[in-house]
């Protein structure tokens, strides 16, 4: 979609591509297509993380986290990969009935959340899929605690996305 707006980018007002209301879809990218492509591109990363996930969830149950938060969950492929890895290859996977895994997919983009939710439902994976901003972890922690009674610190926090579509914000409360 962005290349269809090349005249605005080169000769007009490039800010037009970002001027949308909160309820409108982005006009510079087809986010559903972007989410689909990102999910496939991350498969190599998934393989590397698998060993890490297995080692964490093979520990004695009292040492294991309550679950995992995937920040920038995209299409939900990473949550699906993590769940299947834990279920099939770890001590925790044998204990899911008594020690359920709290899975959270968080994303800044509503289209990504919709795709994640649909993919996880289609794969019969229970997870909370919520809006979250990596630039505001305090709000994410507050939302998790208030809405689900879970502390952010009790989850393994993982992300697979590139920092994109983010406007620079100056740090606040610098010491």
Model-identified regions with their sequence ranges:
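Conserved Class I S-adenosyl-L-methionine-dependent methyltransferase catalytic core
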Residues: 1-67
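Phosphate-coordination loops involved in phosphoryl transfer and adenosine-cofactor binding
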Residues: 65, 100, 154
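Conserved beta-strand/loop positions that form the S-adenosyl-L-methionine
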Residues: 71
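Conserved SAM-binding loop of SAM-dependent methyltransferases across substrates and taxa
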Residues: 75-96
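Conserved SAM/SAH-binding beta-strand->alpha-helix loop
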Residues: 109-110
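S-adenosyl-L-methionine
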Residues: 114-151
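A short SAM/SAH-binding and catalytic strip from SAM-dependent methyltransferases
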Residues: 135-137, 144-174
